[in-house]
Amino acid sequence: MKVFVTGVKGQLGHDVVDELEKRGHEAIGVDIDEMDITDAGSVDRVIREASPDAVIHCAAYTAVDAAEDNLELCRRVNAYGTENIARVCRELDIKMMYISTDYVFNGQGTRPWEPDDEREPLNVYGLTKYEGELAIEQNLTKYFTVRIAWVFGVNGKNFIKPMLRIGKERGAASVVDDQIGSPTY
């Protein structure tokens, strides 16, 4: 299967391409240098040229705190960029996987989130990822939305790497203990 992956320079996109290749799939990874997802023409041209069987959309504006001061940029990437990809996937009848986030929920759950739980984002990042989910739902019938949290892996920046370093340097680390989540490797 030929799979087109956005956000290949990011932690998740990089690892997705690696995993696809290990499993014998042809992975085509792109980042903003090759395809600016906020530019509908760029998205159309690059995906048509690649002619994939499926798209895994990992590219995103993920700076949660900075998003509060950058609503329009965050929206252009997470909502409009996602819609650009969804439209091309619809036109070419390509299956799409959208990587979303638990930030689409309000954080007040007392049990693990279910796919159909009410989405009620509390911040700009969550709002724009929710808008991306809506763009997928309104444009496609062949799609999967995967909501992830606390991403870690071999590549990129993540919580695990500094904790391991601090543990080696100090022998112990203090962290918040009032959060519940589902780490994604």
Regions found by a protein language model. Name each.
Residues 40-77:
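NAD(P)H-binding glycine-rich loop region in Rossmannoid oxidoreductase-like domains
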Residues 2-22:
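N-terminal Rossmann NAD(P)H-binding glycine-rich loop of SDR-like oxidoreductase domains
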Residues 134-182:
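NAD(P)-dependent short-chain dehydrogenase/reductase
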Residues 21-45:
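Adenosine-cofactor binding site in Rossmann-like domains, unifying the SAM/SAH pocket
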Residues 76, 81-84, 91, 104-146, ...:
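Catalytic helix-loop patch of NAD(P)-dependent Rossmann-fold dehydrogenases
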Residues 65-72, 107-111, 156-157:
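Conserved catalytic-core motifs of eukaryotic protein kinase domains, centered on the activation segment
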Residues 55, 69-97:
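NAD(P)-cofactor binding segment of oxidoreductase domains
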Residues 6, 30, 55-59, 96-101, ...:
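SDR active-site strand-loop-helix element
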